[in-house]
């Protein structure tokens, strides 16, 4: 009796193993072709030891279990998010040698080390997006002892001006300010030159009037206080994105509704920060596929996939990169690329942190180091307010 039970379990185990193999190969074939998979084609490519009838029976069971769905036009099967999850969990990252060499060559565009840390991370995201041909985002903490190095003023109309501050670490801060009155021609350029000389501790060129100088100081002090408020008090990591238009080359996102869902999810700062922080201490890539995204953020199924991986300075995670794409991503190649990418980035960031003695802080509702007094705010961020003056 015991022998019969053991033989029955063995036969069941072998059948389950074959069904699993059919699922993996059907998913693999779908990822390669982006076409529904039929039993005949699967037999010809990866399952020559199985009959077409047996494969169809396995397809039917996998469809019942929610791993495959039938394409009503061709009769072939299409993997669901459950199938892609199973595929990811049972395959290791893989890259061909020529792919590795091409990626390593592309990564030489990144600097060996740099103090311009935010700009370099943005450059890294552009490189990664170019390699994968997919949208990329990354989260970043705030880096300490930053300072403003450049100011630009851009007129929108007669009463509004865009104020652009750029910092030593590559941060860019913009805000819109209202002018008290319409300025004469070239007046804004003279004010901009005055403020740039101030930042560089150079004397004024004397070309602007006292009224223009007073207005420049008022505008500068206003925008610096706004900048310091954002810089010192933040509840989420800084989030940067690039390459969103690359979604358009995938058939899945040619449907306006699917594209809108994917973009809405990727551009939701709260959801993306939550997703990027989920496995911040896991050094390998993590895939969130289909309904898994909805489970995490409590949203409708976006019918896409996001793959995340943290990036490190030495043994400390600083943030994470995220890649957005359709559910039929080439997971093995994406995982392998992300691992190579973050290994290189870790070397760069570690060298930069030790060479320039950089430090950072994470978001919190209130930061005890930053008070409401402007003098203490400016000491914390290495930005000085101009002397207070009244407009004449």
Swiss-Prot record:
Gene Ontology biological process terms in this record: negative regulation of DNA-templated transcription
Q: Which residues form a coiled coil?
A: none
Q: Which GO terms describe its molecular function?
A: DNA binding
**What keywords are assigned to this protein?**
Repressor, Stress response, Transcription, Transcription regulation
Database matches in InterPro entries: GAF-like_dom_sf (IPR029016), HrcA (IPR002571), HrcA_C (IPR021153), WH-like_DNA-bd_sf (IPR036388), WH_DNA-bd_sf (IPR036390)
Function, in words: Negative regulator of class I heat shock genes (grpE-dnaK-dnaJ and groELS operons). Prevents heat-shock induction of these operons.
Protein name as it appears in the record: Heat-inducible transcription repressor HrcA
Q: What is the lineage of its organism?
A: Bacteria, Pseudomonadati, Chlamydiota, Chlamydiia, Chlamydiales
């Amino acid at each position: 009796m015991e022998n019969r039970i053991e033989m029955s379990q063995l036969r069941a185990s072998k059948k389950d193993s074959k069904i699993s193999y059919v699922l993996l190969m059907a998913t693999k074939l779908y990822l390669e072709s982006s076409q529904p998979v039929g039993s005949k084609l699967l037999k010809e490519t990866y399952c020559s030891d199985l009959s077409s009838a047996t494969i169809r029976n396995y397809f039917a069971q996998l469809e019942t279990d929610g791993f495959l769905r039938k394409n009503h036009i061709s009769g072939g099967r299409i993997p669901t998010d459950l199938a892609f999850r199973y595929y990811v969990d049972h395959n290791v990252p893989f890259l061909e040698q020529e792919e590795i060499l091409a990626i390593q060559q592309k990564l030489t565009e990144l600097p060996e080390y740099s103090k311009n840390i935010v700009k370099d991370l943005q450059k890294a995201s552009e490189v990664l997006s170019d390699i994968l041909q997919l949208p990329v985002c990354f989260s970043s903490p705030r880096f300490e002892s930053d300072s403003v190095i450049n100011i630009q003023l851009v007129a929108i109309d007669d009463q509004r001006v865009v104020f652009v501050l750029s910092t030593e670490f590559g941060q860019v801060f913009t805000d819109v300010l209202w002018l008290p009155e319409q300025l004469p021609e070239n007046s804004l350029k003279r004010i901009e030159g005055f403020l740039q000389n101030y930042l560089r501790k150079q004397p004024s060129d004397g070309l602007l009037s006292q009224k223009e100088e007073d207005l420049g100081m008022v505008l500068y002090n206003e925008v610096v206080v706004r900048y310091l408020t954002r810089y010192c008090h933040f509840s989420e990591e800084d989030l940067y994105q690039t390459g969103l238009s690359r979604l358009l080359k995938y058939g899945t996102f040619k449907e306006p509704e699917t594209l809108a869902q994917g973009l809405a999810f990727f551009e939701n700062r709260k959801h993306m920060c939550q997703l990027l922080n989920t496995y911040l201490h896991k050094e390998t890539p993590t895939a969130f596929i289909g309904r898994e995204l909805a489970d995490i953020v409590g949203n409708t199924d976006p019918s896409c996939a996001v793959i995340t991986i943290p990036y490190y300075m030495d043994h400390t995670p600083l943030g994470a990169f995220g890649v957005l794409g359709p559910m039929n991503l080439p997971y093995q190649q994406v995982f392998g690329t992300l691992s190579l990418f973050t290994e290189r980035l870790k070397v760069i960031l570690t060298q930069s942190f030790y060479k320039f003695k950089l430090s950072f802080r994470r978001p919190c509702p209130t930061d005890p180091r930053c008070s409401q007094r402007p003098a203490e705010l400016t000491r914390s961020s290495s930005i000085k307010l101009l002397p207070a003056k009244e407009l004449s």
